[in-house]
Structure formats: C-alpha cells, structure tokens
C-alpha cells in the first residue's frame, strides 16, 4: 500500500466527516435564511398575484403582495416567530438532506478521481462536478422528502393556523391523501433537483477553480498552499457559494413553484389567505406549468423569485463555507 493511501482517512471515517459537516452546514444555513424561505413559500402557494404591478388587471385581492409589505404583514400578524414557521420539520429535513448530499457527493467524486483527497477532486472535469451534484441531490431529496413537504405545509399558513403543529399536519395529510401523500410532488422535485443541484455544485467547483487560478497568478507564491482548497480564503468561498446559489435558483425557480403547488394541493387553507390548490388540480408537472402559465402568466411561474434569489445567494454561501470549515474541523479532530 502506498504512503498516499495510508495518509487518506478510512472510508467510513470520511463518510462520517462529510455527513456531519453537511448536517452542520445545512442547519446553520436553514436558521439564517428561514425568514426569506417563509415569504417565498407564501408567494408560491398563493394563486392570486403577488406583485403590485400584476394587480392592475386583476379582480382578485391577494393576501400577500410585495416583499416589504409581506414582511410587515407577517411580523404584525404573527410576530418574529412567524418568520421561522415550519422550522422544526425544515431542520429535520435539511440536516439529513445535506448530510446525505455531501456524503454522496464526496463518494461519487472519490470514485471518479480514484482518491478521497480534496486536492485530487479539484482536478476533476467540470462535467463530473455537475453530474456528482445532481446524483447527490437526488439521493438527498428521496431520503428527506416527507419533512420537506411538512415544512412547506406549515410555512405556508399564517394566523389563524389550520395545522397547529407538525403532528396535526402529518395526520391530516395521511388521512386526506394516504401515505403516498407524504411524497406528493416528488417527481417534479427530482426533475427540479437534477439541474438545480448539478448547477449549484458544478458552478461552485467552477468558481473555486477560477479563484484558485486567480490566487496563483496574482498572489505571492509564499502565501499559497499545497492544498488547493486551503488556498482560498473564507471570503472567496463565500463568494463562490453566493454565485452558485444565485445561478442555480434563477434557472430552476419555475419547477420549485410547481413542486410547492403539488405539496399543498387538496389541503385545508384558511379563506383569509385566498383560494387553495384543489386536489388533483394538476395532472403532472408539465400540466402544472401549463396551467400556471395560462391562468397566472409568466409572473406565476416566478412567484417568490425575489425572496428566493435573495435567500439562495446567502444560503449557498453559508452552506458551502460552513461545510468547508466544519469538514476541516472534523478532519483535524477525527483523523
């Protein structure tokens, strides 16, 4: 066995490091960006227009319209805690999601590179980064989906609540739609996550490569490290995550809107918040996209895009920076 192989952490230990770092990163990111996520979900499940300019030709009176007005309404009616509504299932979703995602991502990259060391992963083709990200996203989605659905249901309601807690939402979904109801919208979610996760991880790796090239060319050689990942500052990692989160969200947002509609269709909704999405309103993802486009226009496919983009940028940045730092800490203390 070569010295290089001996220096690499064991496969099980490496998996624990990736899963643990991913879980920590996901939890931190979720806590920081929850307010924007709640606003985004309120917009996405609202059938009425959400933008002030879109109300001119509409006879409907929406509950929410405009980012700042919605923020004030939620704070006035629900208090500060309203911005973290659905946060328990969100954390129960995001911790296993990011744990699985980063563990699978590292496994796929290790298989492709023939090594578990990060510096060898940096040499992989950008296309492999996109493919690895897509596979990791699919695995993580399937493993944590019921919590994602419960998060959407709880975050989409204001006051008065239809579902007082996660348990009541869970029982109502099972009674209304059966166990399979916990996976409502899984198909469009998987179709969404393939380009989304692929773009997120692929662009992140691409931006990291560009940053490393920049450092090599414009910084003194004495400050560079033998490990490419160490040659980037936390701020550079933050910028890479910021850019990757923004790009992936802008491209995939319409699919996220359809996913949210599937998740809440047929469920109770207080009349105060407008019309509900009826059960079996959409035959499939493409029918959902078509119906939203016909009844709500292009704006309907991009409901919540402003808070979503504002959220995606720091969420991506915080997730990747937290993962890199947590991974380094776990590796230093567990290996």
UniProtKB/Swiss-Prot annotation:
The chain crosses the membrane at residues 13-29, 88-105, 127-150, 182-199, 231-247, 304-323. The keyword Mitochondrion applies. It comes from the Eukaryota. It is found in: Mitochondrion inner membrane. It is a multi-pass membrane protein. Mitochondrial transporter that mediates uptake of thiamine diphosphate (ThDP) into mitochondria. This is Mitochondrial thiamine diphosphate carrier 1. It comes from Arabidopsis thaliana (Mouse-ear cress).
């Amino acid at each position: 066995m070569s010295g290089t192989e001996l220096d690499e952490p064991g496969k099980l230990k490496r998996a624990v490091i990736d899963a643990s770092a991913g879980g920590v990163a996901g939890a931190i990111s979720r806590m920081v960006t929850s307010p924007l996520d709640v606003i985004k979900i309120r917009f996405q499940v609202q059938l009425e227009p959400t933008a002030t300019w879109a109300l001119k030709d509409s006879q409907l009176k929406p509950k929410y319209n405009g980012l700042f007005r919605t923020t004030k309404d939620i704070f006035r009616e629900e208090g500060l805690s309203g911005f973290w509504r659905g946060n328990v299932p969100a954390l129960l979703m995001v911790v296993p999601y990011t744990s699985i995602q980063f563990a699978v991502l590292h496994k796929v990259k290790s298989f492709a590179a023939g090594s578990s060391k990060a510096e060898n992963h940096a040499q992989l083709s950008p296309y492999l980064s996109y493919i690895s990200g897509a596979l990791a996203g699919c695995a993580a989605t399937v493993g944590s989906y019921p919590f994602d659905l419960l998060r959407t249901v709880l975050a989409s309601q204001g006051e008065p609540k239809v579902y007082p807690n996660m348990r009541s939402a869970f029982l109502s979904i099972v009674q209304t739609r059966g166990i399979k109801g916990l996976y409502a919208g899984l198909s469009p979610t998987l179709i969404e996550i393939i380009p989304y996760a692929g773009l997120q991880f692929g662009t992140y790796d691409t931006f990291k490569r560009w940053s490393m090239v920049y450092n090599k060319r414009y910084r003194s050689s004495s400050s560079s490290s033998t490990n490419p990942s160490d040659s980037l500052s936390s701020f550079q990692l933050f910028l890479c995550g910021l850019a990757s989160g923004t790009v992936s969200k802008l491209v995939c947002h319409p699919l996220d809107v359809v996913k949210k509609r599937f998740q809440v269709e047929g469920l109770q909704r207080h009349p105060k918040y407008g019309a509900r999405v009826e059960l079996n309103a959409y035959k499939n993802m493409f029918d959902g996209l078509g119906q939203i486009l016909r009844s709500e226009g292009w704006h309907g496919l991009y409901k919540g895009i402003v808070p979503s983009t504002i959220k995606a940028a720091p969420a991506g940045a915080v997730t990747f920076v937290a993962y890199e730092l947590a991974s380094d800490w776990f590796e230093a203390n567990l290996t």
